[in-house]
Each structure stands twice: as C-alpha cells, then as structure tokens.
Amino acid sequence: MLAWLHASKGQGTEPFGPLGAEPPQQSIGMNDASASQQIDAILRKTTGWRGERLGQLRALIRGADPGVIEEVKWKKPSRPEGVPVWSRDGIVCVGEVLKNAVRLTFPKGAQLKDPKGLFNTRLDSKTVRAIDFHEGEAINAAALKALIVQGARLNRS
C-alpha cells in the first residue's frame, strides 16, 4: 500500500493513479518477487505478438539508460499482476497491454521533444503522451531510446 501513497522523488505527495481513487488491493503471490521477476511473469502471461512486443520495448528501455529501474504498480482485482513501470527519479514510462496494442505512456511526455513523431495517442493531454504499438509495426528504436533518455533526464532536473 505504501507504494501507492509514495510519490516519486522530487514530486509532490499526491498518489499515483486516478484522482480520488482508493489504493488498489495487492496481489498475493507476486508481492515477494522482485519487480523484474514480476515483469517476467507478466510477459509469460501475455501471449502472442503483444507479449513479444512488450518484451522488445522492455529491452529497449533497459538499454537506453542503465539507471532506469523496473517497478510494478497499480495492482488491483481486475489486473492482479499490476503494470510494468520504468523509473529514474520518477516515472519515465508505463507499459500497458491493450486489446489491439501495446502502449507506452510517458507521464511527462508533453515536455519531451519528439522529432520523429512517435507519440500517437494522448495528444490532447497537457502532460501525458503515449505511443500505441500495433501488430506488425516496426519500432523506431533510436527515437524511442531518445525519448527514454529525455524522460529520465527530465526527472533528474
């Protein structure tokens, strides 16, 4: 529960998640595993192209900045395994498996320069930007790594 109430370093004390939302219930069984092991389990559970894509994105994120750490947040009954999160002095990006896409959400994405136009959703938000990856689409690894590095730098500034 403390993870829900604890804000990222250098940020306020507002909880993560929807405003006014109650802290999600913790999943029994995965709490003892490290975040990396929990993400491994999420990848094993996510079959087909979406699991493969999330694994590819994870590798790119980890390779972009060795200081980025893995976390799992927002466990709740409808998603007991939680959501993969990559942080460095605050959240850099969040990975979500959707019905027809794998989404990387950047909580401070509106502040990032995106010269290659990777952001393709949440474009109306004043703070958040996201990228939906669909089956068969290529990943622009260099541009994605640049966004990861920018996001981590922004958190440290």
Description of each model-found segment:
Residues 2-12:
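Extreme N-terminal basic, low-complexity initiation segments
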Residues 5-6, 16-157:
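Charge-dense, helix-prone N-terminal extensions
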